[in-house]
Amino acid sequence: VEAAHLKTDIMSVFDDLTQDDQDSFRFLAVEGCAALGKLLEPQDCLAHILPVIVNFSQDKSWRVRYMVANQLYELCEAVGPDSTKTELVPAYVRLLRDNVAEVRIAAAGKVSKFSRILSPELAIQHILPCVKELSTDSSQHVRSALASVIMGMAPVLGKDATIEQLLPIFLSLLKDEFPDVRLNIISKLDQVNQVIGIDLLSQSLLPAIVELAEDRHWRVRLAIIEYIPLLASQLGVGFFDDKLGALIMQWLKDKEYSIRNAAANNVKRLAAEEFGPEWAMQHIIPQVLDMINDPHYLYRMTILHAISLLAPVLGSEITSTNLLPLVVNASKDRVPNIKFNVAKVLQSLIPIVDESVVESTIRPCLVELSEDPDVDVRFFASQALQSSDQVKMSS
């Protein structure tokens, strides 16, 4: 677009749209602000675009204000840092305190992005007070939007301001009555770890994490489980065993399948990536030995799943000596579901243990299961025997 044409024709149309009585046109004009701002010279942008943005941030239609809140970061890029500080910070603060929840939701979702283009001092002076207000907003969706991005403010504010001012807000949001708020904070905890350090993390956030491990909403418990390996790598094995080790076994007995499954995968990750096979032998296997005899068959199934995941990590010798006897013993279980899962686990162990162990222990157990009264048990046992034959032939 030629500059002369842009200034005369397009800007004329744009000016008409910004003053239109229908809010749908003004709504669309907001997007035009960001696009035009990138095309115009800086002085023209300040003269034509900035006043429009400021006016739109106070528009009588909440839909227009919502659009400004949604596009604000792009609008800041268009008008440059100096104008952002003098003109758009007050506009953004108004949007964060808007009387319509939808506008506050859009504005809250931008706090970290907006703070990144400010100095820490400006962010602390102008944005942080609004963040404190939003953390107790009457709308759960506003709090949820804030929780999904607030962690990103930690690197902007630095360690001291994060500890003194952001951390109390994190902790209050971690205890929010609305599960999505708690969930959004948990999923971004790693961003604050890097700023405040592990010592403070263990003092301040760990009690909240332990509490959330028993949260009534399974998705919150699941989010905590998924955060555990990262936490483990930062806490170290001693601290982890002391503070969080008990949670691992607790999750293996959760009433939700998704939690039990994630917990089993967690055990594998901790053994494979964080603490090693010796840790698993000392801290996990003894408790697995106890749980394989749990009265509830679903928990016994979870342990079988955990064994199948741990075996490749622990290797042939430990699997043959410590895990395989548990699996063979479980083949005598009264529940068909346990027995056909035993057949599946035995099949997964065939490539891990020595061939002599397959012949002396695994095959006899599978042969017995292949004659079980239950059709599913027979099917999976036969499949495992075929797999054993194929491994034998290929070797």
UniProtKB/Swiss-Prot annotation:
Q: Organism's domain of life?
A: Eukaryota
Annotated HEAT repeat ranges: 44-81, 83-120, 122-159, 161-198, 200-237, 239-276, 279-316, 318-355
Output the PROSITE patterns linked to this UniProt entry.
Answer: HEAT_REPEAT (PS50077)
Q: Which GO terms describe its molecular function?
A: protein phosphatase regulator activity
Functionally, this protein is described as follows: The PR65 subunit of protein phosphatase 2A serves as a scaffolding molecule to coordinate the assembly of the catalytic subunit and a variable regulatory B subunit.
Gene3D superfamilies, per the entry: Leucine-rich Repeat Variant
- Keywords from the UniProt entry: Repeat
Family as reported in the entry's similarity comment: Belongs to the phosphatase 2A regulatory subunit A family.
Could you state one GO cellular component term attached to this entry?
A: cytosol
Q: How does it assemble?
A: PP2A exists in several trimeric forms, all of which consist of a core composed of a catalytic subunit associated with a 65 kDa regulatory subunit (PR65) (subunit A). The core complex associates with a third, variable subunit (subunit B), which confers distinct properties to the holoenzyme.
| Name of this protein | Protein phosphatase PP2A regulatory subunit A
